[in-house]
């Protein structure tokens, strides 16, 4: 707004300096619009506008509106001025004579002259003489100073380019009448002009580099005339000046474009923040709607209980009918005694085993209740999209000291902004709202380090595996509610069939796959909590294998593990199961038969990470390589090498995210093969574990920090 007012003031100043200062108009003072008469309303209004301290007040605008009729006439004549084609008619109008019109249109006020750029010489003259000297074509400046060119020189430098473009267009039109454009354009050395965008001609054209004279060094060497050499020298200098001016014009355009880009970037950042705030409010409202649904269900249950109580009370009001209905006969009394004695005998014989079965039934009922409760199924009406608008490599935030020691594993749900993390020493799984960097839950129950976890994408369930040989299933909603109340959470169900540390797990629909150091893989039915299949991985190669990995990094989470996991990673889909083991082999299983159907060989050390999609399986190993395999042909398609052992990886169709016990998390672009890092100058620790979903990357570091990035 300030710039607009400034420009308006300069415009009024320019017009008024002509209208007020003109001395050549003395006829018809009352009626002439450009008259100096103080009774002229237009002149009087302009004079007041320029001299008043508050020229933008309402009174001035009212006076301007009163002269609307005169201004309308001027507007019509102005349209006539700009519509004339001949030079003479350009200065012909109904308001004034040609001489006056020429003065008005060609006049430059002092304010406009002061805006012209000054050279060092003109600045010194201004200081000495108090006036501004304009840069002329013959002026020269010191080579160490940037040359500043006048507007006239800019026009003059553009004329050869414009003339050449016009000549080319005329040539095209003339030849187009004789032949087809497809035959003409190749002869001219140009491609057919297919306009796909406003900048295509600018990118392909070289007209701005055009030199008006063909300077042939061989021809210059053969010139015998000094005058001819001086003429060519002058032309060359002129062309050099013109090229310099064109270069300066192009540089000015670049600066202007940069400024526009900065402004657009600032606007984009503000809009992204606005979208992020909107999505937070959307998630909050969905939580409110979910809470209302829970309360409505509670009201329905309370109503049913009240109905049952009222029905029972109505029966108590008629005690005689109750006595008659409940009085047993002699035969019924005898049968009841026999039934009681039989039941007592059964209880005595099975009492020892009943204690063990009660807990299992309770867990089974808890699982059934969890999956039958519709509130535990994940659903969102509005999906988050803000991550699409961030630039790749942007660090969103850091959760400092999420745990006191190194992060062993983590997982997150980008649709609900929830993050689960585990540390090496605290044996607690923490639940976070990662957008606010706030802890919202804690899962306590394991008695050893948590080595693996997964957040179910369909239900509010978290599965965790530990070195205590157990797998625990948690209700995330219950965990959050108990944490807000200040109470400890309890696991929804515990799977304790493994005999040694659980090293990896994977949830696939209703199935849960778990791998252990006891050399077995178990398949569980999540709805019942029962083990339905066991895979034996006690292969001879695993027993004889010894890792060649050298202990060289004290911060490495891998080195804190006494033994390399026998089964480093697993993943399943439908009836297919993939396992990566410490002998460096990838085995593909058919779960319908329980047999290995393929073996992929290539890694020279233990496999720590593994994941596959419809066509590709990607594995990371302690040998410092990532290998990509084509599942359709079983062929190795690519090898990506790093300096240190791979501790974790994740990928999608575009990128592979890698943690290799180094300072930065690595990114590999699957489309162009480029490698780049998530640069974090504030951190001096190592990246140990990564998860990558929908452009979000979560990295767990050796000091317990969690980094949140966009890839």
Curated annotation (Swiss-Prot):
GO terms for cellular component: mitochondrial outer membrane; transferase complex. Residues 116-139 are annotated as: Disordered. Keywords: Coiled coil, Membrane, Mitochondrion, Mitochondrion outer membrane, Repeat, WD repeat. Its main location: mitochondrion. It is found in: Mitochondrion outer membrane. CDD domains: Mdv1_N, WD40. It is a peripheral membrane protein. Pfam families: WD40. Residues 224-281 form a coiled coil. WD repeats lie at residues 402-442, 445-484, 497-536, 560-601, 602-639, 641-680, 682-711. Involved in mitochondrial fission. Has a partially redundant function to CAF4 in acting as an adapter protein required to form mitochondrial fission complexes. Formation of these complexes is required to promote constriction and fission of the mitochondrial compartment at a late step in mitochondrial division. Belongs to the WD repeat MDV1/CAF4 family. This is Mitochondrial division protein 1. It comes from Candida glabrata (strain ATCC 2001 / BCRC 20586 / JCM 3761 / NBRC 0622 / NRRL Y-65 / CBS 138).
């Amino acid at each position: 707004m300030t710039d607009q007012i400034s420009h308006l003031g300069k415009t009024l100043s320019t017009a008024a300096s002509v209208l007020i200062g003109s001395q050549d108009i003395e006829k018809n003072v009352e009626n002439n619009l450009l008259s100096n008469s103080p009774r002229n309303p237009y002149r009087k209004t302009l004079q007041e506008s320029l001299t008043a301290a508050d020229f933008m007040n309402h009174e001035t605008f009212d006076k301007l509106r009163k002269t609307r009729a005169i201004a309308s006439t001027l507007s019509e004549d102005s349209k006539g001025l700009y519509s004339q084609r001949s030079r003479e008619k350009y200065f012909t109008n109904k308001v004034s004579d040609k001489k006056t019109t020429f003065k008005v249109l060609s006049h430059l006020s002092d304010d406009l002259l002061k805006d012209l750029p000054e050279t060092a010489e003109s600045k010194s003259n201004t200081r000495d003489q108090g006036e501004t000297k304009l840069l002329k074509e013959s002026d020269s400046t010191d080579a160490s100073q940037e040359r500043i060119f006048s507007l006239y020189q800019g026009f003059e430098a553009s004329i050869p380019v414009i003339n050449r473009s016009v000549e080319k267009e005329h040539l095209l039109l003339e030849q187009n009448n004789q032949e087809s454009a497809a035959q003409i354009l190749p002869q001219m050395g140009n491609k057919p002009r297919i306009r796909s965008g406003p900048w295509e001609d600018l990118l392909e054209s070289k007209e701005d580099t055009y030199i008006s004279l063909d300077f042939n060094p061989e021809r210059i060497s053969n010139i015998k005339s000094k005058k001819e050499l001086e003429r060519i020298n002058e032309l060359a200098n002129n062309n050099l000046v013109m090229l310099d001016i064109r270069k300066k014009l192009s540089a000015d355009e670049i600066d202007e474009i940069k400024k526009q880009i900065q402004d657009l970037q600032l606007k984009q950042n503000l809009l992204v923040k606005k979208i992020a705030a909107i999505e937070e409010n959307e998630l909050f409202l969905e939580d409110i709607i979910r809470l209302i649904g829970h309360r409505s269900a509670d009201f329905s249950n309370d109503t049913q209980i009240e109905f049952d109580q009222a029905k029972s009370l109505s029966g108590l009001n008629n005690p005689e009918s109750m006595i008659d209905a409940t009085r047993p006969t002699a035969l019924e009394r005898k049968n009841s005694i026999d039934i009681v004695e039989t039941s007592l005998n059964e209880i005595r014989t099975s009492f020892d085993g009943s204690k063990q079965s009660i807990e299992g039934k309770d867990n089974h009922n808890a699982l059934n209740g969890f999956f039958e409760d519709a509130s535990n199924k994940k659903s969102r009406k509005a999906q988050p999209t803000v991550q699409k608008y961030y630039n790749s490599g942007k660090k969103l935030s850091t959760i400092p000291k999420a745990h006191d020691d190194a992060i062993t594993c983590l997982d997150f749900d980008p649709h609900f902004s929830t993050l689960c993390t585990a540390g090496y020493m605290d044996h607690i799984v923490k639940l976070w709202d990662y957008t606010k960097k706030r802890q919202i839950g804690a899962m306590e129950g394991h008695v050893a380090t948590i080595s693996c976890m997964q957040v179910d994408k369909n239900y509010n369930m978290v599965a965790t595996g530990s070195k205590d040989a157990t797998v625990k299933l948690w209700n995330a909603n219950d965990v959050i509610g108990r944490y807000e109340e200040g109470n400890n959470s309890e696991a929804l169900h515990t799977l304790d069939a493994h005999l040694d540390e659980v090293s990896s797990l994977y949830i696939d629909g209703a199935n849960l796959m778990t791998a252990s150091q006891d050399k077995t893989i178990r398949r569980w039915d999540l709805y019942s909590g029962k083990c339905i299949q066991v895979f034996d991985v006690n292969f001879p190669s695993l027993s004889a294998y010894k890792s060649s990995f050298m202990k060289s990094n004290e911060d490495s989470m891998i080195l804190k593990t006494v033994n390399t996991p026998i089964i480093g990673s697993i993943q399943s889909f439908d009836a297919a199961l993939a396992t990566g083991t410490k002998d460096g082999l990838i085995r593909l299983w058919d779960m319908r038969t329980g047999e290995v159907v393929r073996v992929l060989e290539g890694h020279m050390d233990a496999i720590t990470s593994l994941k596959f999609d419809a066509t590709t399986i990607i594995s990371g190993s302690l040998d410092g390589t990532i290998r990509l395999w084509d599942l359709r042909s079983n062929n190795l398609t690519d090898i990506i090498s790093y300096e240190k052992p791979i501790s974790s990886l994740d990928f999608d169709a575009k990128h592979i995210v890698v943690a290799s016990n180094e300072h930065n998390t690595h990114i590999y672009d699957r489309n162009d093969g480029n490698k780049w890092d998530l640069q974090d100058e504030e951190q001096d620790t190592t990246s140990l574990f990564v998860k990558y979903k929908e452009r979000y990357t979560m990295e767990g570091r050796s000091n317990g920090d969690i980094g949140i990035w966009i890839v």
